[in-house]
């Protein structure tokens, strides 16, 4: 990596946009404007220090950086059929940089690309494998130490090279200085020679002037010229010697420098080769250790030693031509390992790939190469059909035989419902084995049929395994995590009070007086058919009230009210005393473990006896405080308001004793009191918050339904934003109408809420299907023997979930052995067109309880003759359905004697038989009536009349005191004095 890069290149390395990097550089104090601006190492250090400071970490002086680069490539490999297959290969490269003292980053370690290839496992003794693994580990440790020593040597060599370079620079400077001095001396010599020549020229005319030349002395000019030549020659020789000396010295310096560089280069290359060799040896040692570990952990297989030469040649589309006399290539024993030098190459051998390719190569015949000799009977395509058929016999495929293991007892966790295939998978056997065992147990099942928990556990025990009751895949376990994470402070909360008692004892009127509102007048028939929730502010604090129905059909509603409450107000009318629903309310309160405050109502009526009421309550186990019990008795009048304040004081006193607390700053939890389907708002649920705070927008899980709270209303219909503990509210936004009595909770993860709701819905469905299947199999023969049973199919649509539940239970109780109520569907909301279509298909009666049908549904019902009945009071619905079922009952048959006649004469007529002449002694004789023949007060014959005549005319009836003639049908053994008794069979309607 270069020391100077541009902003754009550095941003690409960091996977950031150049604009973001420029902003960070500007914040770090590095002024960069464009992406093409250069970026130095100091700028990068400033940016790194700024980022460390901004993230709150101390910038450490990092000496070593390792970069890991992963790249995925693909190679094409041809199988035995010639088709190319693409194989992904992942290559991992590592590069380590160490910061030197001179500030440069030098790569000290570059890991070879690692290609993931499956190790070939060879069978060996465990002790030998352990020894080899230890040896490989020691070898790897030795390589690591050698690598550390090599790094230290390299550092020392670098320091020595730096010192030698400094000394070399000094020698070069000295040589250059000497060369400069030699050049200067040569220049000085040349200058001196020039000056001498010039002086000689000046001397020549002076001599001519002073001395007259003799005719015999012409040698003066020759001597001067010779002297000049000598001087020039001496200067040139001196200059050339100095230049030669400088050149020789420079050449010597250059040769020394080149030798030093060559030596350094050779040492560097040798060190690099040694590092590569060490790295390669280290990689091989680690690979060998990994192979040994894989061999230790791999299951043992029994391998067949035979390997066909044709199969041993992998990855070759066209087999090489082998001469008939040539020797076949030797088969490498146990897949010979790759050569040591080929470890760094990207080679993917086909024998290291998936075993399915080996199977394909073994099963399918290879394509013969061009020019290969044709050998008959060896699988060649020119050898005829016999050769093709016999080709597979010579090739023995690789055996995948697994040594048999002894039976292993498994712990099988059985949920509430499980299919046959899932149960077989848990026991690691085939589904057919489970089906066989179930057939032995007398159950005919299919592979996808759900089994209940008891049946599945019996099968597991029969198969020899251990059955455990569990639901490991239950996502509801995550709900506990969310609850445990909340550690909020518990604060005092308002009590939740449930008003219970018999019907028409004044529960709603009492609550109405407390709330100062007219609630009872709004209920149909003056009786409560819904569970109501209200909260009231009193001088001593807030109290939340739950008003439950008193009718016997609303048992489930009362049970829910008792479970959600803190205190129960048991309302008993002073004139009626303890009634059946009063006893039931006491049982619900005892089961819930809540204190009871008894309110004896209607004390303003004349002729009441409070002591009688107290005695009846003591008989049921509710003992007043004045008798030494724990239940306060308060006489009240909902009409005049007498005793209401005392009742509230007793309730708040009980609440103080209980010390009711709940967390406020946590996720809300509570109970679904009531639910209905509103045509405009969708599913609406009345919930009571028991802990935490419910807010608009929270994700709520209620049973098998979920949703986000879109709106919240109080009991007066006013919108609110939050609801704390003990506050009843109406919420909207659920996906479906929840079941009344379900727990609801607020969770933070909507995806997890959806998973839990889906799991609960599927669990409910599977449990229901399993129960239905079991009942069908068990009751199959009993239904055949019972004969035809009349069914009354009904569809119930109610306004709220509680009313629908109560009405359905009341109507199902009307079923008898002859007429059964078949509940096709029950739901909440108005009667829609789909409900009418369901009634048409099932021939059911539609019952609307406080609901009506829309225009399309009414029109379709009229066109198809569907009966829709509307009710507001549960009594009327039960009574009318009871009458309808009574009409479906088979009427009873009853005999009624209408008259007697005495035989006084017998007439024999051919072709007719005996004709009896009779006198009607009592009642009347009719032609259509049945007759009994009595002889000596013993019945001899019972049958019908063939004819009845008075004189010669046919008669329909003959009254008392008249004579008649009659003939019995198919009977002639009559005697004088026999008595004929006439009777009719009448049908009498039955009632339930």
UniProtKB/Swiss-Prot annotation:
GTP binds at residues 501-508, 547-551, 601-604. It comes from the Bacteria. Transmembrane segments: none annotated. It is found in: Cytoplasm. One of its GO terms (molecular function) is GTPase activity. Residues 637-639 are annotated as: G5. Residues 547-550 are annotated as: G3. Gene3D superfamilies: P-loop containing nucleotide triphosphate hydrolases, Putative DNA-binding domain, N-terminal subdomain of bacterial translation initiation factor IF2, Translation factors, Translation initiation factor IF- 2, domain 3. Keywords: Cytoplasm, GTP-binding, Initiation factor, Nucleotide-binding, Protein biosynthesis. GO terms for cellular component: cytosol. Residues 526-530 are annotated as: G2. Residues 501-508 are annotated as: G1. Residues 601-604 are annotated as: G4. CDD domains: IF2_eIF5B (cd01887), IF2_mtIF2_II (cd03702), mtIF2_IVc (cd03692). Residues 154-173, 338-399 are annotated as: Disordered. InterPro entries: DNA-bd_dom_put_sf, EF-G-like_DII, EFTu-like_2, IF2_assoc_dom_bac, IF2_II, IF2_N, P-loop_NTPase, Small_GTP-bd. One of the essential components for the initiation of protein synthesis. Protects formylmethionyl-tRNA from spontaneous hydrolysis and promotes its binding to the 30S ribosomal subunits. Also involved in the hydrolysis of GTP during the formation of the 70S ribosomal complex. Belongs to the TRAFAC class translation factor GTPase superfamily. Classic translation factor GTPase family. IF-2 subfamily. PANTHER family: TR-TYPE G DOMAIN-CONTAINING PROTEIN, TRANSLATION INITIATION FACTOR IF-2-RELATED. This is Translation initiation factor IF-2. It comes from Polaromonas naphthalenivorans (strain CJ2).
């Amino acid at each position: 990596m270069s020391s100077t890069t541009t902003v754009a290149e550095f941003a690409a390395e960091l996977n950031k946009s150049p604009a973001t990097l420029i902003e960070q550089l500007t914040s770090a104090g590095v002024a960069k404007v464009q992406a093409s601006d250069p970026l130095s190492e100091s700028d990068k250090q400033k940016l790194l220090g700024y980022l460390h400071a901004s993230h709150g970490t101390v910038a450490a002086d990092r000496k070593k950086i390792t970069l890991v680069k992963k790249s995925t490539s693909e190679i094409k490999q041809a199988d035995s059929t010639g088709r190319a297959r693409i194989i992904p290969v992942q290559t991992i490269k590592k590069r380590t940089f160490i910061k030197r003292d001179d500030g440069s980053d030098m790569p000290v370690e570059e890991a070879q690309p690692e290609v993931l290839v499956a190790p070939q496992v060879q069978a060996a003794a465990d002790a030998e494998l352990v020894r080899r693994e230890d040896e490989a580990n020691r070898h790897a440790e030795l390589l690591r130490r050698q690598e550390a020593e090599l790094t230290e040597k390299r550092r020392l060599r670098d320091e020595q090279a730096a010192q030698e370079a400094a000394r070399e620079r000094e020698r070069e400077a000295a040589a250059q200085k000497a060369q400069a001095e030699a050049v200067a001396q040569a220049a000085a010599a040349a200058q001196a020679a020039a000056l001498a020549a010039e002086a000689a020229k000046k001397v020549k005319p002076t001599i001519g002037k002073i001395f007259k030349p003799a005719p015999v002395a012409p040698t003066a000019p020759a001597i001067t010229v010779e002297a000049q030549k000598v001087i020039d020659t001496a200067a040139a020789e001196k200059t050339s010697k100095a230049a030669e000396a400088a050149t020789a010295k420079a050449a010597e310096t250059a040769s020394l420098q080149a030798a030093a560089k060559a030596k350094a280069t050779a040492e560097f290359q040798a060190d690099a080769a040694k590092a590569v060799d060490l790295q390669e040896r280290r990689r091989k040692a680690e690979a060998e250790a990994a192979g040994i570990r894989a061999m230790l952990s791999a299951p043992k297989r029994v391998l067949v030693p035979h390997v066909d030469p044709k199969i041993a040649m992998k990855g070759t589309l066209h087999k090489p031509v082998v001469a008939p006399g040539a020797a076949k290539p030797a088969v490498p024993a146990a897949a010979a390992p790759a050569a040591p030098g080929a470890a760094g190459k990207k080679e993917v051998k086909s024998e290291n790939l998936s075993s399915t390719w080996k199977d394909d190569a073994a099963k399918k015949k290879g394509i013969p190469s061009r020019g290969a000799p044709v050998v008959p009977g060896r699988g060649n395509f020119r050898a005829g059909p016999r050769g093709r058929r016999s080709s597979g016999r010579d090739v023995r495929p690789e055996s995948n035989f697994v040594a048999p293991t002894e039976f292993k007892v498994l712990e099988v966790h059985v949920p509430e419902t499980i299919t046959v295939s899932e149960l077989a998978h848990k026991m690691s056997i085939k589904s057919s084995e489970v089906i066989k065992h179930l057939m032995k147990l007398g159950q005919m099942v299919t592979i996808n049929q759900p089994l209940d928990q008891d049946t599945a556990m019996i099968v597991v025990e029969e198969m020899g395994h251990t059955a455990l009751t569990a639901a490991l895949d239950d996502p509801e376990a995550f709900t506990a995590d969310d609850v445990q994470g909340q550690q909020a402070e518990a604060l005092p909360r308002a009590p939740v009070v449930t008003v219970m008692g018999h019907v028409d004892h004044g529960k709603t009127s009492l609550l109405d007086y407390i709330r100062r509102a007219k609630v009872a007048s709004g209920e149909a028939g003056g009786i409560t058919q819904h569970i109501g929730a209200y909260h009231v502010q009193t001088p001593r604090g807030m109290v939340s009230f739950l008003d439950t129905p008193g009718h016997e059909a609303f048992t489930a509603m009362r049970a829910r009210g008792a479970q959600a409450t803190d205190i129960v107000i048991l309302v008993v009318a002073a004139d009626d005393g303890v009634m059946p629903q009063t006893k039931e309310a006491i049982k619900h309160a005892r089961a819930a473990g809540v204190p009871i405050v008894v309110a004896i109502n209607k004390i303003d009526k004349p002729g009441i006896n409070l002591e009688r009421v107290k005695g009846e309550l003591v008989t049921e186990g509710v003992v007043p405080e004045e008798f030494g019990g724990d239940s306060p008795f308060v006489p009240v009048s909902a009409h005049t308001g007498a005793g209401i304040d005392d009742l509230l004081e007793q309730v708040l006193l009980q609440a103080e004793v209980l010390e009711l607390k709940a967390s406020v700053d946590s996720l809300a939890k509570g109970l679904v009191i009531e639910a209905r389907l509103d045509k405009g708002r969708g599913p609406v649920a009345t919930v009571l918050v028991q802990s935490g705070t419910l807010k608009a927008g929270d994700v709520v899980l209620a049973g098998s339904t979920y949703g986000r709270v879109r709106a919240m209303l109080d009991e007066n219909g006013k919108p609110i934003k939050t609801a704390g503990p003990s506050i009843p509210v109406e919420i909207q936004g659920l996906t479906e109408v929840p079941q009344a009595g379900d727990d609801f909770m607020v969770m933070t993860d909507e995806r997890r809420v959806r998973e839990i709701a889906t799991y609960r819905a599927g669990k409910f469905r599977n449990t229901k299907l399993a129960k239905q299947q079991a009942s069908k199999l068990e009751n199959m023969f009993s239904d055949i023997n019972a004969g035809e049973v009349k069914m009354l199919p009904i569809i119930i649509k109610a306004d709220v979930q509680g009313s629908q539940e109560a009405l359905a239970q009341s109507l199902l109780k009307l079923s008898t052995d002859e007429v059964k109520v078949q509940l096709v569907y029950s739901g909440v909301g108005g009667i829609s067109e789909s409900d009418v279509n369901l009634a048409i298909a099932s021939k059911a009666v539609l019952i609307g309880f406080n609901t009506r049908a829309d225009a399309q549904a009414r029109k379709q019902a009229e066109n198809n003759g569907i009966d829709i009945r509307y009710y507001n009071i549960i009594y009327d619905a039960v009574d009318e359905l009871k009458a309808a079922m009574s009409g479906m009952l088979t009427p009873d048959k009853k005999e009624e004697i209408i008259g007697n006649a005495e035989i006084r004469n017998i007439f024999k007529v051919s072709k007719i038989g005996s004709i009896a002449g009779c006198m009607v002694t009592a009642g009347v004789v009719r032609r259509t009536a049945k007759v009994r023949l009595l002889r000596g007060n013993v019945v001899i014959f019972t049958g019908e009349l063939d004819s009845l005549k008075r004189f010669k005319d046919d008669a329909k009836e003959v009254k008392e005191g008249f004579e008649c003639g009659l003939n019995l049908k198919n009977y002639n053994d009559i005697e004088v004095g026999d008595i004929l008794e006439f009777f009719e069979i009448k049908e009498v309607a039955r009632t339930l």
